Amino acid sequence: MSSIMYHDNHLTDSGKNMSSGLSLLAYVTVMVAEEEEQRSRLLAEKREESKCKMSFFYLFPRKIKSSLAKRRYTQQNPNGASTCSSSLPDLNLIPTDFETDNLQNPCFDEPMVCDEEQRLKKGKSKIVYDEDYDDESEKKLFDNLNGASTSSSSLLNLPCLEPSTETKDVPNPNYQSSSPSSCLTGKTNRKRRAVEQRKSGKVKKVKVSPLPRLCTEMPEWIFQVMRYMNADAETPRLIFERTLFKSDVNSNLSRLLMPFQKLIRNDFLTPAECRAMQKDEDNDEEDDENIGVGTVLVNQRFQKWGLRFKIWAMEKDSGHGTLNYTLNWGWNDVVKSSSLKVGDKISLWTFRCRGVLCFALDTE
């Protein structure tokens, strides 16, 4: 009997040890699962943070060029869709939290990153963000852009905007006229002619050109855009003002030209962006796929688009040409959404968001 009781007690102790071991194993399993879950969550957060930081670094799609037959069909059917409309996705169709009746509180948090499959279909115009650059390469680039050659065979050899070297002759205050009465005689003759013109009714009206606007106040809505986009802490720059012509709103052209000679300032590009816009001399392709910088344009209605900013050479029959900056690959969408028309006065301001070149389009 005693041996049986001892055996039962021995089994009870073994069962207790087994139960304790199972409990410990279950505890360890739970701890490992929790650690794995925490590790996965941290990796997901880091991946999301990295994705957010790189939200502007994406490739813009190339515009699909339609065939000649399709272009003729579009011209014959003006009610049809434009063949030059941008192939870029409309960034304003993405639902966001700021699309409310109150336009004073916009928010610009919608993603602008495309998946890998779409990236393969896009062109090579991209956002440039490169702080490390070669000083010698930069100097060579700006020397090329400022070259004074009149040959039209190369893009960079066309005449560019150069600082004016004209000087006005300042009269010498110590100069004495050889004829003491010459000044008096001139004044008398002018007065006599003025009296005769008033009597005959043939008074010429002097055309006074309006004074240029030396200082343009930045619109308040640009401050709001920069604040909600977390833009870089720098003052926006007014680079271009223009009254729109027919070519600027032509859907078949789909671009806004900014001649170098008409720019208010031309110091808003980084050296990396200048290199990206420089034409590859060895590239014989007609599309110039390697030229251009991806930018973001925002209008007064707090709408934004991804456009391409590049150098555009306008060649003339005389052999000379002009250099222009141009915004395309989506300009038709900007014209339509902003209700732009011939005669509208526009101004372009530049700022940067996380180092990316952005434009603010203001209309009067």
Swiss-Prot record:
It comes from Arabidopsis thaliana (Mouse-ear cress). The keyword DNA-binding applies. Its main location: nucleus. The lineage of its organism: Eukaryota, Viridiplantae, Streptophyta, Embryophyta, Tracheophyta. It is found in: Nucleus. GO terms for cellular component: nucleus. SUPFAM superfamilies: DNA-binding pseudobarrel domain. This is B3 domain-containing protein At5g38490. It holds the Pfam family At2g31720-like. GO terms for molecular function: DNA binding. Residues 148-202 are annotated as: Disordered. Residues 260-364 bind DNA. PANTHER family: B3 DOMAIN PLANT PROTEIN-RELATED (PTHR31541), TF-B3 DOMAIN-CONTAINING PROTEIN (PTHR31541:SF34). The keyword DNA-binding applies. It comes from the Eukaryota. InterPro entries: At2g31720-like (IPR005508), B3_DNA-bd (IPR003340), DNA-bd_pseudobarrel_sf (IPR015300). Keywords: DNA-binding, Nucleus, Transcription, Transcription regulation.
